[in-house]
């Protein structure tokens, strides 16, 4: 029997990517797509590339009706907007996957400090599971409320998890340098994402104050078993999709590149979407575009005693909607790669 799925906020980039993936998912049936801006329009009128794949009409949000008709509800809205839906899901015994930030941070005070929004569903935070399958698969399997990770945190945590789990680095030395495509800024109009502002340009933004910082530190700390503080600098690339993160850390003891690579291969053995690349091969965003893969490459700088790890993901797939569907598959007891398998487009 197909899993009945609804998407709240279907016409943003992450919502549309959910529709694209779920429209070809063999075990999912889309039953409702909500939007504030396009109610009454066919979804393919908003996103013509899905003409012939989806015939649903966009509708205004009616939480009781959505929960009644759905097994799983995805919320693809900006932070601050998932709390009412999560409360309704809790009341009706439905499962909800939030692609925003409302349930990622366990301390509501940290959330309110970084996002400048009051958290009105604090009672649900303890039961929310951080939806990074490679780290929390067992908890996701039993979850009713999944906080889908942010795009930058996904790339950073997957790059660092094996090192922290095996206590191979000095946790006070971590530097994360990430570059993202423009789709990470969303579909809304903003000066910083206009073509003439982005084209032939490359810039850092929100240096030392990006909202994903506490999320990265929280989850790295859970893996390490101790508090972790990082220096995180995001950059905007003049491309549509992709995140490339370069992570630097001081080794706790001397180790060679092949020794470190074996740690990664062992940690990610059996993972359907993490590809640890061979020696001499470093990830590129073009290799993962349109896929749920995370490619990881590494090297050891013996001169400085630092390990350098690079990870590449598609920010809209593994960094958002693909990972959300991966979480749905886990919750529903389906093979994790259902609807997600296969290479991307190249070139």
UniProtKB/Swiss-Prot annotation:
Q: Where is the active site?
A: 151
UniProtKB keywords: Amino-acid biosynthesis, Arginine biosynthesis, Cytoplasm, NADP, Oxidoreductase
Where mainly found? cytoplasm
Catalytic activities: N-acetyl-L-glutamate 5-semialdehyde + phosphate + NADP(+) = N-acetyl-L-glutamyl 5-phosphate + NADPH + H(+)
State a GO cellular component annotated for this protein: cytoplasm
Q: Which GO terms are recorded in the biological process aspect for this UniProt protein?
A: L-arginine biosynthetic process
Location within or outside the cell: Cytoplasm
Q: Which SMART domains match?
A: Semialdhyde_dh
The family database entries (CDD domains) matched by this protein are listed as:
AGPR_1_C, AGPR_1_N
Q: What is its EC number?
A: 1.2.1.38
Pathway this chain belongs to: Amino-acid biosynthesis; L-arginine biosynthesis; N(2)-acetyl-L-ornithine from L-glutamate: step 3/4
Protein's job: Catalyzes the NADPH-dependent reduction of N-acetyl-5-glutamyl phosphate to yield N-acetyl-L-glutamate 5-semialdehyde.
User: What protein is this chain from?
Assistant: N-acetyl-gamma-glutamyl-phosphate reductase
Provide the species name.
Pelotomaculum thermopropionicum (strain DSM 13744 / JCM 10971 / SI)
User: What gene makes this protein?
Assistant: argC
